[in-house]
Amino acid sequence: MLAAAKGLLGHVPLYVTLQRGLGADRLRYRCLDELSLADGDTVIDVGCGPAYYFERLPRVRYYGFDTAPRYIEYARNRWGSDRAEFRCEVFGAEHLSQVPPADAVLLLGLLHHLSDEESRHVLRVAARALAPGGRVIAVDTCYEPRQGRISRWMSDNDRGEHVREPAGFTALARESFEEVDGEIIDDVTRIPSSFWLMRMRKPLH
């Protein structure tokens, strides 16, 4: 039953409806608010999914990457324009010459789907993609000591196979960034859930 429910999330309009119904959209909006983006900024969104939060952005130059064709097709049809580009590709070092340096890189709900080595690679490339003064922000399902039973169940049954404690995410980020900090978010979704919001600045490489 749980596997069937997860499979339904591949249906893009249903996924978007569920995200909003559960309050997960507010989690992403909180990340965007952290960045205080302005018109003309460049944003790279890795693992953008259907990018349903695009309408909350100012008039930025946006590059969204995801490996799910249905998500990218939805995003292109909805938001594609001369300032918003969506690519069904794995974001990597080869893209650094194709997009301008970023004022912000978004990793929203991505790292808990990636192994440690995959996460290291994404974080290294994200660090290299930043313009001077640029920032990376990530948010992921996490484990944390204060979790109640429902929240822990949500972490145990997340679609991501690499849900970590905050220290695990932070250790990976510190390999690529001089400044890393974060906070546990557990008050935005309608079902009790715990998330690690992580801010990264000053690339080491």
Where are these regions (language model features)?
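A conserved beta-strand element that flanks and buttresses the S-adenosyl-L-methionine
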Residues: L106
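Class I (Rossmann-like) S-adenosyl-L-methionine-dependent methyltransferase catalytic domain
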Residues: M1-T42, V46-Q98, L114-H121, V125, ...
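Hydrophobic adenine-recognition pocket in adenosine-nucleotide-binding enzymes
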Residues: L110
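Short glycine-dipeptide loop
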Residues: L130-V136
